[in-house]
C-alpha cells in the first residue's frame, strides 16, 4: 500500500511540538509493517538543509507561482519537498515572524501544501502515486478538500493532533487557492464566515483520527470541540472517527541507549538514574540531595498545559520537601512567574526558558516525577517519556493522559498496574492532593521502585499504532 503523509514538521529537522515527533516515527514504523510510505513537506530552510540531496520531480505552475517538487531521502524515508522560496524560505518559526505574528500569507503557504499533495495523487510524479493521503493538522487540512474537488483520486485520512489550532482565514481567498465556491458553506469548510483548514480536513476526509481514544470521545463534546463538536459527533456516529494512541520512538527515547544522558540505565540498574539526578540538580542550581524528589515540567508554558496550577501548588510542593525543575517557553506571563519563583525559592526551583532537545532528555532522566496537569491533552508524549525513563507521571485525567497513566491508588498498587499519579478536577487543590500522594509513595522507596519498574516495562512503541493505521487504510 502506497501512503503519503502530508505535514509541516519532521523530527529532528524541524520541531515546534509533538506533531514533528509523530511524523518522525510513524512512517518508519509503517514501512517496517510492509507499507510503501513517503512524506510531503514545505521546503522550509531547516528541512532543505537536513535533506540536501534531492532530485527534481517536476516544475509546475500553481496559484502561488512557479513551484518545484523535489524528492530525497531522510533516514530511509522518501521525502517530497515543495521548493517555493518566496513562501517558505524564512528564518525561524515556520508559522510566524520574530514578533510572533502569524505570516499574512499562511493561507497561501499551507493551501499549496494541500494542493501539491492532491497533484501527487493525480499523477504529478510519474513513478509513484499514493493510494492513501494522510494529512496532519490544519496545515495539511486542505489536501482532503482538494482531493474531494478532484473526484477523490486517493483515499484520505485526517489526523487531529490538537483541535485548538484551526487555521482560520478570510473567505475571500477561496478563489485564489482554487477551491470550488460551493465548498464555502456549513457543509464544507466554512466556519463562522471564514475558511477553516482544520474543518476542511474534518469534513472532506474519508476518515478522521485523533491521537488517543479518550480525546476522540472528548472532542465530540462542547467543552473540547471548539465549535466542531457537531461535525465530530456526526463522524463518530458514521464510524468515521477513531482514536489511535501515539507511540514513543525507542531509537530516540530509551534510557539504556540514550547518549544524551550523563549515565544510561535500565529498570534493573536504577542507581545510575540517581547520577542523572545529581547532574540535573547541579545544572539547575538546586540543592544536591537524593532525599528530595524533583518534580519536572518539560512543556510549552501555556494555560492549556495547566502550568498556572503548578505555580499555585508550588508552595505546597516545596513545603512537603520537593524541588521543581522547569524547561519550556511560551506565554510571557507564565515565563516571568516561573523565573520569579526560581528567584524566590533559590536552590529549590530551577527554570530554563527555551526548548533544548538534549536537555529535555536529561531533565526527564534526572527528575523523579514529570508534571503534566493539562486542561486538555490530545495525546501527550512527555508522560510516555516519563514512563520509559522511570520518572513517574503526575497527570490530569484527560485525553491521552487518561489512556496511558494508571493512578497509584491502593487497588492499583495491589494488582501491580499503577504507573503514576492521576487527578480529575482542573484546580490547584486537586493537583496538591495528587502531589501529596506522590510524597506518600516517595516515603516508601520499595514501593516507589516497584512502580518505576512497572512503568519502564510498559510498551508504547509505534508498532501498534502503525498496524492500526494500516488496518484503517485498508478499510477505506
Curated annotation (Swiss-Prot):
Highest taxon of source: Bacteria
A GO cellular component annotation in the UniProt record: cytosol
Top enzyme category: transferase
GO process annotations (BP): glycogen biosynthetic process
Record-linked CDD domains: GT5_Glycogen_synthase_DULL1-like
Molecular-function GO term, any one: alpha-1,4-glucan glucosyltransferase (UDP-glucose donor) activity
Recorded catalytic activity of this chain's protein: [(1->4)-alpha-D-glucosyl](n) + ADP-alpha-D-glucose = [(1->4)-alpha-D-glucosyl](n+1) + ADP + H(+)
Keyword Glycosyltransferase attributed: yes
Keyword list, A-Z: Glycogen biosynthesis, Glycosyltransferase, Transferase
UniProt-annotated binding residues for ADP-alpha-D-glucose: 15
Enzyme Commission number(s): 2.4.1.21
Pathway noted in the entry: Glycan biosynthesis; glycogen biosynthesis
InterPro entries: Glyco_trans_1 (IPR001296), GS/SS (IPR011835), Starch_synth_cat_dom (IPR013534)
Family note: Belongs to the glycosyltransferase 1 family. Bacterial/plant glycogen synthase subfamily.
Role played: Synthesizes alpha-1,4-glucan chains using ADP-glucose.
Protein name: Glycogen synthase
Gene encoding the protein: glgA
